[in-house]
Amino acid sequence: MSRSISRRSLALCVATATSLSVAAPASSAAIVNNVIEHSAADASLKLTPVGTYESGVYAESAAEIVAFHPDSNRILTVNAHAGQIDVLDASAPANPTLIGSISAGEGKEINSVAVRPDGLAVAAVQQADKTEDGEALFFNAAAADLDTAEVGRVMVGALPDNVHLTADGGYALLANEGEPSNELNAEGTDYVTDPEGSVSVIKLPEAVEAPTQADARIAGFTAFDDQPLPEGVRVFGPSGHDSKPSIDFEPEYITSQDGKAFVSLQEANAIGVIDIESATVEKILPAHIADHSQVPLDPSNKDDAAELRTLPVKGLSMPDSIGAFTAGGQTYFATANEGEAREWGIKEKDGGSGVYTDEVELKDLVEDGKVCEGALGDVNVEELADKKHAGNLKLSNASGWNEEKGCFDELYAYGSRSFSIYDSEGNVVFDSGAEFEKITAELNEPGIFHHNADNEEAEFDDRSDNKGPEPEALTIGTVGERTYAFIGAERVGGIFVYDVTDPATASFVTYVNNRDFSTDEFAAAGDLGPEGFAFVDKADSPNGEHLLIVGNEVSGTTTVYNVEDLLKADEDNQDDADDHDNEDKSSQSSHSSTATIAVGSLIGVIAAVAAAVGLLNAPGVRETVLSFAPAPLREQLEKFL
């Protein structure tokens, strides 16, 4: 674990060294003093938070999905709280500033946004009544006057929750979740309304203008209502509900590669494959199921320990974010395996007709005699049901039920606490298993880092019984010749980075968490609840560096990270060394002159660092100062520091 402060502050110190003055460090409550960093010994990448925009709105989804438009250097941040897209000027990544917004209209919400290189942007708009058809709102992200940036809208399916643009910019794809109404019928046996889930496939014009309604087609799931589904794919609901794929499948997140789209069907524990040109769902793939008798997890929030153990329980991956990429000429997609229960209705004591949910605790199934005899092997069932072991672990009663026996012969928890990589046929080629929780358990230290904390409270072990770190956000980026997956942990926070260049042998690179666990005060806690990621290639970046932009729904912050290629840094250092070794020894006078300049620069740097001696006391500052010093001076400066 290492800690760091703003790299921008240190850059200013070094850049102004020769004038013997130090610029005042930039400060932001959203970039904490002690950024958590845990990396592999051979880490090829480094993440450093450099700037943030603070909405000042907490626990209200004021910063969710993010997108970046290179030509205007603008970040588009979904502010669901206000029903708008916040437009940020990121020309200085260390200081993103709000310049305006795009509104969905009174009573409407925006759930997602994406933007094309020419500035054509599309937002997914949810109606005040979420069961009604939503809208795709098109606007010019580079418009000088954002009040007139909107160029049109088309209707899409109910509750568009995510929007994705194909790589060629030819199509906008919207995942229409089609969630049921919040209320049940008078008998409490069915939803009042439950619209179909679908994917809108919208052909886009070449210009920055809106498509017509005729350009929007719907890819639905009706064709699968009468077909057998792959094992592990779930269709379920209240007792009086007409459960079938066309209604029960709720598209969550979408990605595409080479003419095919892949959409996560979270509650169904499935992935849909869509042919984009024909706007047709071709097949349904079962999502990964973890075997926790082999892959350990931390199942208890009552044992006062960061302890992983194996259990006779399965884990439904139930993916949220999904990202496609190519490797070796083949298509793959990665998923963040969050998990999600269904819970709809209003309690009778609150004037409703009851609540439907598939969530149940392990101890309740045991105490009610609903676990089939021998189903859990030779495990002591009473011990398993103890709250300090796994009694509070949240399970789904929609899986594992043996109708003939009238009991559960398998137990299924929500989420696999991992991320997975699939090939285009749906075969799982890699899963991170227990690595996320092993890392956070290793980092656990009171007041410094709290394993399985929630995103609104920093209490240690709080989420162990309920999806653990809850991986939700995911994006793919290429740095140098390597491909990386960035995965966000919604609850404990932070970003896991894996090298997925060879998908079958993907490996952990680093974990960074810009959070202060010593406080529950939102304004001082840093980033809470990473919801959406946008990777920016250095060719498109305002500062010439790879960037990762993160929308944090609980803290309401939009934070920019520098993504440093450590492999490239190593190569540059080696080149410097080689150049030095190969210099002509006959040019001694030239060397003397260079040395004189170097010594003068060194004196300036030392003077500046001395002026900033307060910064030197902070852990991690010494290393960062050295990283900014010219290569020939580092050895001498290192001795001084």
Annotate the PLM regions:
Residues S2, R7, A23, A94, ...:
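Selective for proline/serine-rich intrinsically disordered segments
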Residues S2-A30:
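Secretory targeting and sorting signals
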Residues S6, T505, A595-T596:
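Structural motif marking the loop-to-transmembrane transition
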Residues C13-A15, A23, V50, S101, ...:
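Low-complexity, intrinsically disordered/propeptide-like segments
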Residues A15-A17, D147, L165, S593-A595:
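Intrinsically disordered/low-complexity terminal segments and short unstructured peptides
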Residues S27-A29, D572-L641:
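Composition-driven, intrinsically disordered low-complexity tracts enriched in small residues
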Residues A30-E571:
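Beta-sheet-rich non-transmembrane sensory/scaffold domains
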